[in-house]
Amino acid sequence: MFDLILKNGLIVDPLNGTNEVGDLAVKEGKIEMIGHDLSNAKEIEDCQGKLVMPGLIDAHMHFGSVYGSKHGARMTALAGVTTCLDMAGPLDEVLKTTKRSGAGITFGIVDRYDPNSMHGTASPSDKQITDWTHSHTEGGALGVKLVGGHWPLDPATCHKVIELCNEENLYVAWHAGSTNNKS
């Protein structure tokens, strides 16, 4: 017996070349079978006129208040996204907001580094960069996002952050811009 059968949906699975109307059976959280006229399940859901496909991955989105919304996790889930990468944080806020939303999204955070507001300078010391990076990755961030396009950083700071992330095998993202080109 299956736990769930999704009946009569348009099943799309690019990896396996599936693009047809049919039934999809789930057992213990895993797809057990794709076919036609499947039955014998604890729950059967009619999906006629609907897509049945793997969850989408959004590699760049924002849950935090700086660029996003407290409703971001719910809105993202409603769009079919099951896995995403928040590219700005702030870490603590995103963790609280997504936990409260109950949307069930798997996500990671690459936290925004803005030394002007965090340290009062666009040219922080190596220790300031290292301490901030460690405190955020220990808190759950996967890496650092430089937001030079919004808050220009000097090239030396950008270099230090990228070098540190490389040494420590952390993600680094860069919203291009520096004090050299005033962007």
Task: Give residue spans per PLM region.
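Divalent metal-coordination and catalytic microenvironments
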Residues: 9, 24, 29, 49, ...
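N-terminal metal-binding scaffold of metallo-dependent hydrolase/deaminase domains
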Residues: 1-40
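Short, solvent-exposed loop/turn elements at domain surfaces
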Residues: 13-14, 53, 117
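Generic detector of well-ordered alpha-helical packing
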Residues: 14, 47, 59-61, 87, ...
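Histidine-centered catalytic micro-motifs
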Residues: 55-66, 148, 172-179
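Divalent-metal coordination cores built from histidine and acidic residues
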Residues: 47, 69-153, 157, 162-170
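Catalytic core of soluble alpha/beta enzymes
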Residues: 181-183
